[in-house]
Each structure stands twice: as C-alpha cells, then as structure tokens.
Amino acid sequence: NLFYSISDIERVGDHAENLVESVEYMKDRGIDLTESGIEDIRQIGAAAVKSFDHAVRARQYNSMDEVRKVGQYEDEVDNLEEEFREKHVERLSNGECNASSGMVFMDIISNLERVSDHAYNLAGYIKDEM
C-alpha cells in the first residue's frame, strides 16, 4: 500500500503542476475568469486541499476519523465539480465568458477534483491497513 500511496502523492504533484501551467497559460494570453468562476475555483480548491490534508493526517495519526473526513470532502468536491460545470455552461450561454477562459476553468476544476480523488485513494489504503 505504501507504493500505491507514493504513486498517488506523485500524481497530486502532477495535478499541482497542471494548475500552475493553467495559470501561466492564462497570464501569457491575457485570459481572465469571471468573478463567479474565480469564486468557484476558490471553493472547490479549498475542499480539495482539505481532502488531501485529511489524508495526510490519516496516515500520520492512523486515524479512521480522518479517513472518513477525506470521504466527506471527496464527495463535496465531486458535487461542486458537477455544479460548477453546469454554472460554467450557463455563463457561456449568457456570454459572460468565452471559450478560452472556459477551457482553462474546466481544466482547473478537473485537476482539483483529481487531487481529491487521489486523497481518497490514500485514505482507502490507510483504511485497508487498519
């Protein structure tokens, strides 16, 4: 399980790198997100970070309570991703944003959701060891 844990942690690093590349892409091309889109990213990002933080704590303290928290945050992130994709389609339909900013927005929330998925995997390995 430790080998799989290391692999998931490495994948989280890959997603973090993807997030940096998305921001650099926006900066280089002068792409801006709507305030609503930025707030959506803040919200899903905070939940994804919490899921990973609880996965680290679950490993550190061998805590089933922390494992459960990872699951709760992972569910929240999944729900937020679905909600924010729908909101994004509405913003596109209303002309509030364009295809370029929309592509970056979708990439960002997808990468954040994958961080949460890997946190959930980590929690699962810990649960299996208990």
Where are these regions (language model features)?
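Cytosolic, long alpha-helical scaffolding segments
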Residues: 1-130
